[in-house]
């Protein structure tokens, strides 16, 4: 049975077609998998496990159903949903992974990340990321009333979008030196991440041999997801209409 990797769904109530695409994926692709890894930005925004919107509840129910059928589900934080907690992970029947997460993938030393920590050329973003990932900041934010958290999240998203419009594309992509450093630090042959919305397979010739970096796609009318088994890793294109 294969292992599947997806990221950057950015689920939100305003995009029902996207939710339907994901549910069709769960019904028609994921049941054949040993495990499903969701590598961040699963939701467009997350302000706490206590929000329990109809979308969040239905997504949890669908994932839990898949987990009960035998597929192991793993969640990793992204830059939009880093406040997902153990409560919601349990509701989904999923395991919440720390980032980065190392694993032996059918004999291949591998590392899973969301990918934003690789974008070190964007110094302003990395500074903000350090603040948002600080446990003290998160605890203080989560202690506020839900409506205040929702308002703050909307305001911060507007600010982020405005800032990103003025950034060069190269700044928002991964830094090559950071990628090489990650391979060397963890001694891996395969790096899998999302975040950049630039699905591709990148190969590097390092002293230890050829290594690969797989970038997963975001979701819209189509996506690019990862499929691994004993025969290797594939980055596969999937159109929503193909599983409607």
From Swiss-Prot:
Broad class of the protein's primary localization: membrane
- Cofactors required: Mn(2+)
Annotated pathway: Glycolipid biosynthesis; lipid IV(A) biosynthesis; lipid IV(A) from (3R)-3-hydroxytetradecanoyl-[acyl-carrier-protein] and UDP-N-acetyl-alpha-D-glucosamine: step 4/6
Provide the cofactor note recorded for this chain's UniProt entry.
Binds 2 Mn(2+) ions per subunit in a binuclear metal center.
Which residues are listed for Mn(2+) 1 binding in this entry? 8, 10, 41, 197
Chain residues that bind Mn(2+) 2: 41, 79, 114, 195
Mind telling me which Pfam families this protein's record contains?
Metallophos
Give the reactions, separated by semicolons, that this protein catalyses: UDP-2-N,3-O-bis[(3R)-3-hydroxytetradecanoyl]-alpha-D-glucosamine + H2O = 2-N,3-O-bis[(3R)-3-hydroxytetradecanoyl]-alpha-D-glucosaminyl 1-phosphate + UMP + 2 H(+)
Q: Where in the cell is it found?
A: Cell inner membrane
GO CC entries:
cytoplasm; extrinsic component of plasma membrane
The entry marks the following residues as binding substrate, namely 79-80, 122, 160, 164, 167, 195
What Gene3D superfamilies does the annotation carry? 3.60.21.10
Q: What class of enzyme is it?
A: hydrolase
SUPFAM superfamilies in the record: Metallo-dependent phosphatases (SSF56300)
EC number(s)? 3.6.1.54
- Read off the NCBIfam families from this record: lipid_A_lpxH, PRK05340.1
Which HAMAP family does its entry note?
A: LpxH
State the protein's purpose. Hydrolyzes the pyrophosphate bond of UDP-2,3-diacylglucosamine to yield 2,3-diacylglucosamine 1-phosphate (lipid X) and UMP by catalyzing the attack of water at the alpha-P atom. Involved in the biosynthesis of lipid A, a phosphorylated glycolipid that anchors the lipopolysaccharide to the outer membrane of the cell.
Its family remark reads:
Belongs to the LpxH family.
Which protein, by its recorded name, is this? UDP-2,3-diacylglucosamine hydrolase
**What gene is it encoded by?**
lpxH
């Amino acid at each position: 049975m294969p292992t599947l990797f997806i990221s950057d769904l950015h689920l939100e109530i305003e995009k029902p077609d996207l939710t339907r695409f994901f549910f069709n994926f769960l019904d028609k692709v994921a049941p054949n998998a040993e495990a499903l890894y969701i590598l961040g930005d699963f939701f467009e925004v997350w302000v706490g496990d206590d929000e329990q919107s109809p979308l969040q509840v239905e997504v949890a129910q669908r994932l839990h159903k898949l987990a009960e059928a035998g597929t192991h589900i793993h969640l990793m934080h992204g830059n939009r949903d880093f406040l997902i907690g153990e409560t919601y992970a349990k509701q989904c029947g999923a395991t919440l992974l720390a980032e980065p997460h190392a694993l032996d993938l059918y004999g291949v030393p591998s590392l899973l990340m969301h990918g934003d920590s690789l974008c070190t050329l964007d110094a302003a973003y990395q500074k903000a990321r350090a603040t948002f990932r600080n446990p003290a900041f998160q605890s203080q934010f989560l202690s506020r009333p839900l409506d205040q958290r929702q308002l703050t999240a909307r305001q911060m998203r507007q600010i982020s979008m405005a800032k990103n419009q003025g950034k060069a594309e190269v700044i928002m992509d991964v830094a090559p030196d950071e990628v090489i450093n990650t391979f060397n630090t963890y001694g891996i042959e395969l790096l899998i991440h999302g975040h950049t919305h630039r699905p591709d397979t990148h190969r590097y010739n390092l002293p230890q041999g050829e290594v690969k970096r797989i970038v997963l796609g975001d979701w819209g009318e189509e996506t690019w997801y990862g499929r691994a088994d004993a025969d290797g890793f594939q980055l596969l294109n999937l159109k929503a209409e193909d599983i409607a």
